[in-house]
Amino acid sequence: MDSFPLLAALFFIAATITFLSFRRRRNLPPGPFPYPIVGNMLQLGANPHQVFAKLSKRYGPLMSIHLGSLYTVIVSSPEMAKEILHRHGQVFSGRTIAQAVHACDHDKISMGFLPVASEWRDMRKICKEQMFSNQSMEASQGLRRQKLQQLLDHVQKCSDSGRAVDIREAAFITTLNLMSATLFSSQATEFDSKATMEFKEIIEGVATIVGVPNFADYFPILRPFDPQGVKRRADVFFGKLLAKIEGYLNERLESKRANPNAPKKDDFLEIVVDIIQANEFKLKTHHFTHLMLDLFVGGSDTNTTSIEWAMSELVMNPDKMARLKAELKSVAGDEKIVDESAMPKLPYLQAVIKEVMRIHPPGPLLLPRKAESDQEVNGYLIPKGTQILINAYAIGRDPSIWTDPETFDPERFLDNKIDFKGQDYELLPFGSGRRVCPGMPLATRILHMATATLVHNFDWKLEDDSTAAADHAGELFGVAVRRAVPLRIIPIVKS
């Protein structure tokens, strides 16, 4: 307790010096007045992506925000996003790293946070050319088909008993099963099981601790003290998940040593084992276990959120639901599971998913970037060390880009070639440039196929339609922005 006055004094001095030094700069992007010490933090509210979108209408597409002592520039237009992510992509390739990400040295090992150097390039090459190649995705689609059948069986049981389906819960378990099948040829969880809840606790523990507001991220002087216990809790959850992944990998390595001529499996783990045994890259086993942690946590949270929003929008817009059902019926017929190879024949399904990503980007501010050197953008100075947040939410709802941006209208994409693969800066749910999400090929397959399975096989009605509009409008900010109220809808077998 005796050290507290000294700590408080140092904290105040550091924050004041930082504040005054930034006030002296005359060529920063405009923004709201920052108060000493706290900056603009008191203005953010529960949904900062919405607040930033409103403020950008006043201050412009490049906006200065002070989050404590962390100077941040908010990017809110496709033109400025292209400047940051493409034209000056090398300068803005750094990462602002939250304290929680230091757990188990994840910040030093994960491809998502490694500097753009040799290790990062090797990991990127493996992801692009081997793990997420078209050949790899096609080889593992049979595994995913089995897990979609389990989703179908679960919903059928709910329909038979007249129970509502918690779409978030069903989407979460299905996403974990689809990912564990693709990564490990195994089933991570089952519906309504104890193992499900244990695995869910670990995954959500990691996602929650990474997304929780942490004073030490905004005031780095506090990091050694970990005042909220974020780092300590992150070490626990990261450690549990890494232990599970390492168990899968060690089991496969041992199996390959014992029986080197055994038939190969069509999962990612087989690719990883081959790479490790070939010793082709200067990478260690932990690079791959941390990559799989990123895939599990990022993929489960974003896909779960997007599937729930897709079903929420379709239930609230029955004419769009009917059109999608008709398209699925015309292509899949009486087949219960729509084949992944049928995707090019399903333009309306693709349009629905694009529209969901436009209105509800799962990570509305994307992963933070950091300026590696001073850089001028659009006539403004962005100093070295600045955190960069791309407001995909604001871009997706900008009326100068989209007609009736608050309206769910998949038809807007039927004659529009805009895609979310990183080349069109109007739609950036997976980012763009050298830091684009490496798991996008798997994530998009999961999202399209899970949504198609739910829509194709059942009609749906709300469990309680008295609060439907308010529930649909509410958002809960985190690593991914969820519905504030979980979507519960009753499945009805189509007659």
From Swiss-Prot:
Its recorded reaction(s) are: abieta-8,11,13-triene + reduced [NADPH--hemoprotein reductase] + O2 = ferruginol + oxidized [NADPH--hemoprotein reductase] + H2O + H(+)
Domain of life assignment: Eukaryota
Query: In the record, what terms sit under GO molecular function?
Result: heme binding; iron ion binding; oxidoreductase activity, acting on paired donors, with incorporation or reduction of molecular oxygen, reduced flavin or flavoprotein as one donor, and incorporation of one atom of oxygen
Cite a single Pfam family from the UniProt record. Answer: p450
PROSITE patterns, from UniProt?
CYTOCHROME_P450
As cofactor, the record names: heme
- The residue ranges crossing the membrane are 2-22
Q: Which residues lie on this side of the membrane: Cytoplasmic?
A: 23-495
Q: What GO cellular-component annotations does this UniProt entry give? A: endoplasmic reticulum membrane
What subcellular compartments does it reside in? Endoplasmic reticulum membrane
| Tissue specificity remark | Expression is more abundant in the rhizome.
Chain ranges sitting on the Lumenal side read 1
Q: What class of enzyme is it?
A: oxidoreductase
Q: What is its EC number?
A: 1.14.14.175
Q: Which PANTHER family match?
A: CYTOCHROME P450, FAMILY 76, SUBFAMILY C, POLYPEPTIDE 5-RELATED (PTHR47950), GERANIOL 8-HYDROXYLASE-LIKE (PTHR47950:SF4)
Family named by the database record = Belongs to the cytochrome P450 family.
Q: What job does the chain carry out? A: Cytochrome P450 enzyme (CYP) which catalyzes a unique two-electron oxidation cascade on abieta-8,11,13-triene to produce ferruginol, an intermediate in tanshinone biosynthesis.
Protein name, per record: Ferruginol synthase
